[in-house]
């Protein structure tokens, strides 16, 4: 059981502007990157490998293929560095964690699209 004050502070920091998404969905995460004294938005486009719902400590992992190499990146859902999340395709998967996709390539790595 958490302290009521801690719950109140955490609730005030939760983001409500992000769309609903699930494992398997193809998304683009636009996040702020700081290079020297400049800031810019960088897009990371891939599919959601896993999602962890823990209130303020929620996180999700996005996987993409870059130059034939699999790249995974984990984001904190309520991070102020995330500018926006765009859901491009909804997927129809039967698992909550898609770790088996790491070993698949080509046609075997396709995800069925939700109609």
From Swiss-Prot:
User: Which BP terms in the Gene Ontology apply to this protein?
Assistant: translation
Q: Which SUPFAM superfamilies match?
A: Translation proteins SH3-like domain (SSF50104)
User: Is the Ribosomal protein keyword given for this protein?
Assistant: yes
Q: Which GO terms describe its cellular component?
A: cytosolic large ribosomal subunit
Q: Pfam families given for it?
A: Ribosomal_L19 (PF01245)
Q: Does the keyword Ribosomal protein apply?
A: yes
User: Which molecular-function annotations from GO does this UniProt entry contain?
Assistant: structural constituent of ribosome
Cite the entry's keywords alphabetically. Answer: Ribonucleoprotein, Ribosomal protein
What does the UniProt function comment say about this protein? This protein is located at the 30S-50S ribosomal subunit interface and may play a role in the structure and function of the aminoacyl-tRNA binding site.
Question: Known HAMAP family for this protein?
Answer: Ribosomal_bL19
The record's family statement is: Belongs to the bacterial ribosomal protein bL19 family.
The name of this protein is: Large ribosomal subunit protein bL19
Which species is this UniProt entry from? Francisella tularensis subsp. tularensis (strain SCHU S4 / Schu 4)
Upper lineage? Bacteria, Pseudomonadati, Pseudomonadota, Gammaproteobacteria, Thiotrichales
- The encoding gene: rplS
């Amino acid at each position: 059981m958490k302290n009521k004050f801690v719950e109140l502070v955490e609730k005030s920091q939760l983001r409500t502007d992000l769309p609903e998404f699930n494992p398997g969905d193809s998304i683009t995460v636009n996040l702020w990157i700081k290079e020297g004294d400049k800031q810019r938005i960088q897009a990371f486009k891939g599919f959601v490998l896993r999602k962890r719902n823990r209130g303020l400590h929620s996180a999700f992992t996005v996987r993409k293929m870059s130059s034939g190499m699999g790249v995974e990146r984990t984001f904190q859902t309520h991070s102020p560095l995330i500018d926006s999340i765009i859901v491009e395709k909804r997927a129809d998967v039967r698992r909550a964690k898609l770790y088996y996709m790491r070993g698949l390539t080509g046609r075997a790595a396709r995800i069925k699209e939700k109609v």
